[in-house]
């Protein structure tokens, strides 16, 4: 009958829908058993929520700051997957967009992959809409070295609060979350510009661009309209042991006089310096797009920058060390690099990120050259043998708990010799136990490493926190056939300079 036929059709549609649903498995990052929210700070307190200040900050910081701290600006989830496509679905609690900023920028997410040679790829997953926002990323290729897929970085909404989030993969594919990085972060305290206005998507906020370029965790404490160098916020900032503090608050200090700005900047630096010796970078106001047409805007940013520069010079005269200054001219934003009068577009964000990166590389002594052998990158060429990132975490932990007298940096030839951290296989345990262990060696070899991978590891702490008597370097074999002789020699020269800066008293072999 016709009625029976209709029932059958409805059942078929239902079964088809169920079948399609069953083809995907959904994973909640917060349920994987260990902290995975990158770039957060206070992980032990808030590692189960996509927020930026701990609960105890409520009532201590002003309500607008507290409310904005519920936004997920700068936060990210890192994972490995071999899936040919990915989905992300989530809900947020605030408005999806603003008059000067689209839904993709306010409430969207971004996904990038990193292949086994450390190269990044951006994926487009559609446009989010509705109560449950969803992205679908397709055409994810295969890695040329193995079938274990890529590393992925999922960047979260800069201007909204996530209620829940899940990542989907086809049911026969794998997804493995990556634990929170143990490395010291960079901490950025700023305004709406730091929070992300008006980037078109999360990956294009200048703090996130900087984080991708440097590879260090970056805690984004940008608060729209509320980056005011307040003591109460700085109290929480001082709880974070950062490798660098960036203060970029001048655009929210417009009502202040020059002398008031000088005092605020000076007090902020002294408050941080009272508990931390890490470098502090002061960033000038980048200016306004319409400053040439509106003289009051010109006077505003000139006054603020003069006040900040005066504070910087006075602090230097007082003998406060490791403070640095980035000028408006060094930032170099073009008048067309803003969405409105003060909030940068993607172009402006990239311009600012590049300017800050140049200064940060100078401060932290992490230069990057023009040759591939002088550009620090990660790798993941042998995940069926060992996980490169896990070995890095293990080495940092071992060096901290048991500082070595000597280290050997290299590739698989040294990795699988013996010693700690233990590799997946050992081919020279007898000689290691007889010669290397009594000499106090730690094995810093990684299978399939190239010069540029060792450079990344040196920049990311494997020679920090101890004084070695000897550093043995054996690298370059895996660059043969990829790089010419000059590139290999220059890469080794570049690497040796980085080693010497971190271990000035060690004998290098």
Regions of interest found by a model, annotated:
Residues 1-8:
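Short, small-residue-biased leader/transition segments that mark boundaries at the very start
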Residues 22, 100-102, 110, 142-148, ...:
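Serine-esterase "nucleophile elbow" of acetyl-processing enzymes
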Residues 23-70:
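Glycan-recognition and processing domains
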Residues 66-178, 383-384:
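Extended, charged alpha/beta regions that create polyanion-binding interfaces
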Residues 70, 226, 230-369, 426-440, ...:
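Alpha-helical cap/lid subdomain in secreted, periplasmic
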């Amino acid at each position: 009958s016709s009625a029976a036929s209709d029932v059958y059709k409805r059942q078929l549609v239902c079964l088809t829908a169920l079948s399609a649903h069953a083809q995907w498995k959904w994973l909640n990052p917060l349920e994987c058993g260990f902290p995975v929210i990158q770039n957060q700070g206070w992980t032990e307190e808030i590692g189960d929520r996509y927020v930026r200040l701990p609960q105890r900050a409520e009532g201590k910081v002003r309500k607008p700051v507290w409310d904005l701290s519920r936004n997920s600006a700068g936060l990210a989830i890192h994972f490995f997957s071999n899936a040919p496509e990915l989905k992300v679905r989530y809900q947020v609690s605030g408005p999806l967009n603003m008059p000067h900023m689209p839904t993709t920028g306010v409430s969207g997410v971004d996904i990038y992959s990193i292949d086994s040679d450390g190269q990044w790829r951006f994926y487009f997953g559609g446009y989010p809409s509705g109560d449950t926002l969803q992205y679908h990323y397709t055409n994810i290729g295969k890695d040329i070295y193995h079938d274990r897929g890529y590393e992925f970085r999922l960047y979260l909404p800069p201007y909204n609060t996530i209620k829940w989030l899940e990542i989907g993969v086809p049911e026969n594919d794998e997804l493995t979350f990556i634990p929170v990085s143990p490395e010291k972060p960079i901490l950025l305290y700023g305004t709406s510009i730091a929070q992300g206005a008006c980037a078109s998507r999360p990956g294009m906020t200048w703090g996130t661009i900087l984080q991708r370029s440097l590879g260090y965790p970056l805690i984004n404490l940008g608060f729209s309209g509320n980056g005011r160098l307040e003591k109460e916020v700085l109290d929480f900032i001082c709880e974070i042991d950062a490798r660098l503090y960036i203060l970029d608050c001048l655009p929210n200090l417009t009502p202040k006089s020059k002398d008031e700005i000088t005092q605020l900047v000076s007090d902020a630096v002294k408050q941080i310096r009272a508990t931390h010796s890490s470098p502090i970078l002061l960033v000038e106001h980048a200016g306004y797009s319409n400053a040439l047409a509106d003289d009051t805007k010109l006077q505003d940013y000139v006054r603020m920058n003069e006040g900040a520069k005066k504070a910087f010079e006075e602090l230097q005269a007082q003998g406060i060390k490791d403070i640095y200054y980035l000028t408006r001219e060094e930032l170099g934003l073009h008048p067309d690099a803003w969405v409105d009068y003060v909030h940068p577009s993607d172009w402006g964000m990239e311009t600012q990120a590049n300017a800050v990166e140049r200064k940060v590389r100078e401060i932290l002594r992490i230069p990057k050259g023009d040759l591939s052998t002088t550009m620090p990158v990660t790798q993941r060429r042998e995940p069926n043998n060992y996980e490169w990132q896990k070995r890095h975490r293990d080495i940092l932990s071992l060096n901290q708990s048991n500082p070595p007298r000597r280290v050997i940096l290299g590739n698989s030839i040294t990795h699988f010799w013996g010693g700690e951290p233990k590799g997946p296989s050992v081919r020279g345990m007898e000689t290691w136990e007889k010669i290397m262990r009594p000499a106090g060696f730690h094995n810093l070899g990684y299978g399939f490493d190239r010069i540029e991978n060792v450079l990344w590891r040196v920049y990311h702490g494997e020679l920090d926190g101890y004084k070695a008597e000897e550093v043995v370097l054996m690298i370059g074999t895996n660059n043969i056939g990829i790089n010419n002789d000059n590139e290999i020699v220059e890469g080794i020269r570049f690497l040796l300079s980085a080693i010497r800066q971190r271990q000035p008293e060690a004998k290098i072999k």
